């Protein structure tokens, strides 16, 4: 299609929460508090696992990497959301918008792969306990972690490449809280059917495939737990999976509804609500889920606090 007579949009305006203009300052304070607690919580888990030798196991190795990825995942969107809540000019450059989409989706994909790796780790620990030490070696853990990061960073390249070639001649108002594929594609001055299809296929492969692998792992885990004769043994097995399974339900419940759907239209209120869940609430809840439900992490935090003299 000839785009020679069209002027390319240089920046976008992120509308954010247009129906809540009167309470922007309160939203800012609430979001700032959530962001600070998210950063502190995930950073605490990452440092505690790194510093406490008792937590140098495959399960906590993946937990620490997940917490580290959450720091980048939230940094990709929340600081800009905070700035927009205080600013009259809620703009972002075209290249800045694409960078935000890239980092948000690459780190989100990394989280999908890490959650899958954690499910596989729990499957080996519960279903094949005798072979677990020889199967889940430190070398394999490192290789899986590197694979998760490389796969995540490479994931959005095709979609970003395609969207960067689209003409955007106006309007330039993004009806969302941050830059993302669906709301940005809706502003293109040409047919985006190919982009929507590619986005759907990639997200289906990435999100559905990892979710199904996690489900398969948990089906095997449940079958194994049901065969455990003692109630104490069943409780112990379930306790090692409860935190991870809770995170999976919250995270995948929102991203499946948002991204695994073949559509060109965009629903402001519905998609904004989902975006807040998977971009703000899930990273915020993860440290609480992993620490409050995990005695080993709570004990490790106490040991580190005693070591530096905060606790007697």
From Swiss-Prot:
Primary role: Odorant receptor.
Family under the similarity heading: Belongs to the G-protein coupled receptor 1 family.
PANTHER family given in the database record: G-PROTEIN COUPLED RECEPTOR, OLFACTORY RECEPTOR
Name listed for the protein in its UniProt record: Olfactory receptor 6N1
GO biological process terms on file: detection of chemical stimulus involved in sensory perception of smell
Principal localisation: membrane
GO terms of molecular function: G protein-coupled receptor activity; olfactory receptor activity
SS bond partners: 97-189
Cytoplasmic face residues: 47-54, 121-139, 218-237, 293-312
Source organism (scientific name): Homo sapiens (Human)
Gene that produces this protein: OR6N1
Topological relation to the membrane, as annotated: Multi-pass membrane protein
Keyword terms, alphabetized: Cell membrane, Disulfide bond, G-protein coupled receptor, Glycoprotein, Membrane, Olfaction, Receptor, Sensory transduction, Transducer, Transmembrane, Transmembrane helix
